[in-house]
Amino acid sequence: MSDQKVFARYKANEIVTDLQHFGVKKFKSNITRRKNALRKIIANLVLGNYGEMSVLFSELLKFWQIEDDLEVKRICHEYIRVIGALKPQQAREALPFIMDDFKSRDEKLQIMALRTLVLVPVKELSDQAFDCIISLVNHKSPPEQVTRTAIYALLDLDEIDHERVLGLSSILHDIVKAQSSSPEVIVAALHTLYSIHEKNANMEPFRIPLELAFDMLELLPELNEWNKATVLEVLTTSVVPQHYLDTHEMIELALPYLQQVNTYVVLNSLKFIMYLLNYVDVIKETLAEKLSNSVIALLDKPPELQFLVLRNVILLLLSRESSLLRLDISYFFIEYNDPIYIKDTKLECLYLLANKETLPRILEELEQYATDIDIQMSRKSVRAIGNLAVKLDEDSVHDCVAVLLDLLEFGVDYVVQEIISVFRNILRKYPNNFKANVTELVKHTEVVQEPESKNAMIWIITQYSDVIPNYLELFRVFSSNMFSETLEVQFSILNSAIKFFIRSPTKETEELCMDLLKGCIDHENNPDLRDKTLMYWRLLSLTKTSRISNAITFESLKSVLDGELPLIEMNTKLDPTVLEELELNIGTIVSIYLKPVSHIFRLNKTKLLPQSPILNPNKDLLPVVGNSFPPTGANRDRQNSESQSSTKSRKTAMMDDYDKPAEKINQLKGKRKSSSNNPSKLSRKPSTLLRKLSMKRPFS
């Protein structure tokens, strides 16, 4: 039966015809028809047809009694999970059948039954779930998958009865500390304890002893990819180093997982290492290279993962005054087939990586993007050039302005408008450096059509009227159509007219000013514009009437309405507290938004660095050295000697991948050759083949 026929709303009596009371033999001979009817029930539950489907409860119980088919059992359990929350009495009636499945020898049935007990919010089922979990974790040799399910089920039961779950937490602690269970069960217990602490705001942050942290790190080779990532995530903020030597050893144990193919493992390893770097005295140069190479390797992932990585690159670039990552800017050059969200994020990375040395190559790229056929990309590239001019020092701004003036000659309307918009910010930062270019900008007065570019052009004409001979003529291009403009442009026109009159109270400026004031009062209905107009009118009337005791002079009025503007600055720094919290959430959705957790998930706990005698108050002062770390493990008495011997045996394991190509073993690619060394623009951007040919071993 097709999905289209299954996923349709049915009446209960329509499905009952397929579930009529036949004998057991009749049921056995009509399996397909019976299963299709059951599938229709689940499909209607998905569609929200609860009222009709709840009528079929008694029919479903009869199937439950006689059927051994796993799919039928799965449908029955799914039915109870959905209907049980709406009809608690039906869930109670189904409890004996659920327990029969739990007591069976089939692990899959046991897991189904346990999940049903946990997910139905009925007291009788929850009590039975607690009893089942206790019996499983206390059993001498329970099935591994069932035990894992039971441990993870405590997270759902925690929302129902937190105090009762806390009573079982000691059992989970024993599982983790004993290290006698299977690795998957140990990880499940560790993650459950961590999640319970994270979900409850009134509980202290989860902490584990240092020795247990080393045991978990040494257990990583035995785990699958997802469990590796889970352990690394839990260890972040849970283990608090007390000595530099311990920190360096944990970093060494976590470093190999930067080379994993699984992105989740790499990001959690990166997060764990970045966390530990808050508790070191020095940073090794090779560590910075390995971190950089792992990030570079992640840039070859699919676009969705690449976007996550790029957002985390922005976070890491913001984390220190001098970035720890050694990233060549060519990795962030935009490709024609990049999605728009990748292009935007790469532009942000280029902006953060820009300095005096990299600026020429970045400007060369941005100039090409600005002439691209993609209008949105072209605009953002021009905006990026303008932002770089404001961000960098005075020596670099001339290069940015030269590129903008070249693009101005390009003559495309949207490019010209964007250039005028960004030039306003440049003139705000350097008011006296580019007066000679103002006359070139105002030649394009007729081109500007968008509110932002109109505002920018009006501001430029007003601010530099002393170097524009026909400034009033240019201004009338905008003022003549004032009442058809947007509100923000109307404000700009009104402000500029007042400034012209205050600076030069001639008959021409007075007429212009009075016409606009009267027009705003007589023809405009916007209360904000009318209020501002009346305020200006009142101020001007006070300057003209000397008989009034509170009259003010033109000079006083000029200081209020036409004062000197402060220089603007581009601030790319985040609040240190917010930055600290974001670093502890690398690889999560918080790192995409670059906002505190509380702004995105209201109920989540804020992560902070645990206090320690070796916690660095200012990581910008950490030296990056080329010499090796102190010998790991020296002068440290490990409590578990068996763990030491197992670690040594793992380190001396024979290599079993000698017959595989090197590129299959090491998935990371090396630093791409710089494209700016070749003056030819045709071969300036490296192709995919060139990238592969320029690969080298990143961790050598």
From Swiss-Prot:
Alphabetical keyword list: Cell membrane, Coated pit, Endocytosis, Membrane, Phosphoprotein, Protein transport, Transport
Residues with PTM Phosphothreonine: T652
Region (Disordered): 625-700
Compositionally biased tracts (Basic and acidic residues): 653-663
Signal sequence annotation: none
Residues the record lists as Phosphoserine modifications: S649, S683
GO annotation terms (biological process): endocytosis; intracellular protein transport; vesicle-mediated transport
The keyword Protein transport appears for this protein: yes
Localization annotation: Cell membrane; Membrane, Coated pit
Assigned GO CC terms: AP-2 adaptor complex; cellular bud neck; endocytic vesicle
First-listed, main subcellular location of the protein, grouped into a coarse class: membrane
A Gene Ontology molecular function term of the record: clathrin binding
Function of the protein: Adaptins are components of the adaptor complexes which link clathrin to receptors in coated vesicles. Clathrin-associated protein complexes are believed to interact with the cytoplasmic tails of membrane proteins, leading to their selection and concentration. Beta adaptin is a subunit of the plasma membrane adaptor.
Subunit structure: Adaptor protein complex 2 (AP-2) is a heterotetramer composed of two large adaptins (alpha-type subunit APL3 and beta-type subunit APL1), a medium chain (mu-type subunit APM4) and a small adaptin (sigma-type subunit APS2). Interacts with APS2.
Miscellaneous comment in the UniProt entry for this protein: Present with 1670 molecules/cell in log phase SD medium.
PANTHER family given in the database record: ADAPTOR COMPLEX SUBUNIT BETA FAMILY MEMBER (PTHR11134)
Protein name: AP-2 complex subunit beta
Gene: APL1
